[in-house]
C-alpha cells in the first residue's frame, strides 16, 4: 500500500519540473498530453491503493467496513436527516394526507359495493317473499281442511279400534258359558241327619 502512494507523490513532485522544462508551443502540447497521462496513471494508482486498503480493513474488522454495510448506514442516516428537515416534514405530511384520502376513497367504494350487493339481493329476494306471503295467505284456508282431515282420521281410527270390541266381548261370554256348561250338574244336600240332630254330610254331585 505504501508503494503506490510513494509513486504518486514522486510523480506529483516531478510534474512541475516537466511542465516548466518545455519552451516552445510543440513542447507545451506534448507536455500537456504527458501531464494528462501521468494524472490518469496517478488516479488509477490511488484508486487501486484505496481498494486494497479498504478490502484489508474490511477483512480485519469482520465485515464492519464492508461497502454494502457502509452504504446502507449512509443511506439510512441521509434519509433520517431528510425526514427531519422542513422539506422532509412537508413531504411526509403530503404522504399522510394522500394515504388518508386513499383510505376514504376505499371505504366509499366498499360502501357503494355493499349497497349494490344489498340492492341486488333485495331484488332477487322479492319473488321469494311474494311466494311466502301467498303461502301465508292461503294457510288460514288450509287450516280447517287439515283439522277436518285429522278429525276424520281420528274417527276412522276409533271405528277400527272399536269394531273388535263386540267380538271380543262375545268371545269372552262364550268362553264363560262353556266353562259353566263344563261344571254344570246337580247338587243335593242331605238334611235328614241334621233334622234328626246329627251331623250329616253335605254331598254335592256335579
Swiss-Prot record:
GO CC aspect terms: plasma membrane
Keywords carried by this UniProt record: Membrane, Phosphoprotein, Transmembrane, Transmembrane helix
Listed transmembrane segments: 34-54
Pfam families referenced in this protein's UniProt entry, alphabetically: PTPRCAP
Residues annotated with Phosphoserine modification: 99, 153
One GO process term, biological-process aspect: defense response
Membrane-topology descriptor: Single-pass membrane protein
Low complexity bias (residue ranges): 161-173
Location in the cell: Membrane
Cross-referenced InterPro entries: PTPRCAP
Span list, region Disordered: 98-173
Keyword Phosphoprotein: yes
Protein name: Protein tyrosine phosphatase receptor type C-associated protein
Species this protein is from: Homo sapiens (Human)
